[in-house]
Amino acid sequence: MSASPIENLIKSLAVMPGLGPRSARRAALYLIKKRETALYNLAQALDEVQQSLVICPECGNIDSCNPCSICSDPKRDDALLCVVEEVADLWALDRSRLFAGRFHVLGGRLSALDGITPEDLSIDALVKRVQSGKIKEVVLAMNATLEGQTTAHYITDCLEKYPVRITQLAHGLPVGGELDYLDDGTLAQALRARRPVS
């Protein structure tokens, strides 16, 4: 006997990050209750996403145009390339409006535990972009995890033979953070990355 449409909706929602079975059930009930607005709008948005989204062949961003709006922006600095693990990281950095260069999405990070090797990531495409000679600085914007830092070191090794400056995002104290609430690793990194005030 096949599952009901409601059960299928709950199962589909439950696979999303941050939604367990209970949250998925609540979300499904909300959508059903508001089916004239919320459910219809969600279904329409999902259909549009399915029909129009493209993975940019240049950087790996997800957009509705090819190349993506970032890669096709002539105001961006071609000499700066920011390497991120996932599209969500690209979106977060771009939303800050503090980086005006290009991006490269790896599609994950190296992880022996999860069996993710360099071949599973777009590291070869990154090296080809650097080989083009246009890029003068590569900013490694990996997460401050063991896997993120392992990935950053691997990329550094891959790029060290090219005439490109390799930098990494600073890690340390969050704005508004209090010292007694920070973990030892964050405090140690903040101390190592300290800079003069004048």
UniProtKB/Swiss-Prot annotation:
Q: Which organism is it from?
A: Zymomonas mobilis subsp. mobilis (strain ATCC 31821 / ZM4 / CP4)
**This protein's record includes keyword Ribosomal protein:** no
* GO biological process terms held by the UniProt record: DNA recombination; DNA repair
**Protein name, as recorded:** Recombination protein RecR
Family membership: Belongs to the RecR family.
Which key words are in the record?
Answer: DNA damage, DNA recombination, DNA repair, Metal-binding, Zinc, Zinc-finger
- One Pfam entry for this protein is RecR_C
* C4-type zinc finger segments: 56-71
